[in-house]
UniProtKB/Swiss-Prot annotation:
UniProt GO BP: DNA repair; DNA replication; negative regulation of DNA-templated transcription; proteolysis; SOS response
Entry annotated with the keyword Repressor: yes
Enzyme superclass (EC): hydrolase
Family, per entry: Belongs to the peptidase S24 family.
EC number: 3.4.21.88
Name the record gives this protein: LexA repressor
Species name: Allorhizobium ampelinum (strain ATCC BAA-846 / DSM 112012 / S4) (Agrobacterium vitis (strain S4))
Pfam family, one: Peptidase_S24
């Protein structure tokens, strides 16, 4: 039997994975549960792991997977009405496989896909030059895309590792010019630097927040930052 805090954390991780395809950071979990420190989150995650509700994914920074939900929680979760269900796609020796973003889903080979352009590299670290032209196309599952126009970018850097985004990943981006606080976005700074960061507001300013304590949050005036798109999923290949 889970405690109330354990249930709250499990549901928060589950819902975030369904929404964005990547697990929440420890800071986000701490804030969501109104805890004073991240040590409390560590204890809750350990307890959930010991009871078989989640597991930590090896060789990834703080990456988690929900294995199951208690029956009482499953029956109380309303069906989602969003038009798409972003997820992480992992490739093994060239074959793409869908990694389930909800419990009890079986991993199956992706059949229905759409081709989208890869527009170059995006910095998850120190911003690099602005997004380049189309370099090649990749196939992405239709269920990841939903509505709107999409493109892909190859990630360079480690500033988003606590959001489950690693150096070498390919992120799937939906075209957008606006974002909500907490969204992971492609931001163009001063019309010349492109970076992948979490979008925040600091009064009238815009904060581009990393998911790695080694990187500082960067603050800009609203006229210096243009939103180029929002993260809907990512692709990871193993060679």
């Amino acid at each position: 039997m889970l405690t109330r805090k354990q249930q709250e954390l499990l549901l928060f991780i589950h819902e975030r994975m369904k929404e964005s395809g990547v697990p929440p950071s420890f800071d986000e979990m701490k804030d969501a549960l109104d805890l004073a420190s991240k040590s409390g989150i560590h204890r809750l995650i350990t307890a959930l792991e010991e009871r078989g509700f989640i597991r930590r994914l090896p060789n990834r920074a703080r990456a988690l997977e929900v294995i199951k939900l208690p029956e009482a929680m499953t029956s109380s979760i309303p069906p989602r009405r969003t038009g798409f269900s972003p997820s992480v796609i992992e490739g093994s020796r060239g074959k793409l496989q869908a990694v389930p973003s909800a419990p009890a889903k079986q991993v199956e080979e992706v059949r229905n896909s759409s081709s989208i352009p890869v527009m170059g590299r995006i910095a998850a670290g120190v911003p690099i030059s602005a997004i380049q032209n189309n370099t090649h196309d990749i196939s992405v599952p239709m269920e990841m895309l939903g509505s709107g126009e999409h493109y892909a970018l190859e990630v360079k850097g480690d500033s988003m590792i606590e959001a489950g985004i690693l150096d070498g990943d390919t992120v799937i981006i939906r075209n957008a010019t606006t974002a909500n606080p907490g969204d992971i976005v492609v931001a163009l700074v001063d019309d010349e630097e492109a970076t992948l960061k979490r979008f925040r507001r600091r009064g009238a300013s815009i904060a581009l927040e990393a998911a790695n304590p080694a990187y500082e949050t960067r603050i800009f005036g609203p006229d210096r930052v243009k939103i180029q798109g929002k993260l809907v999923g990512l692709i990871r290949r193993y060679h």
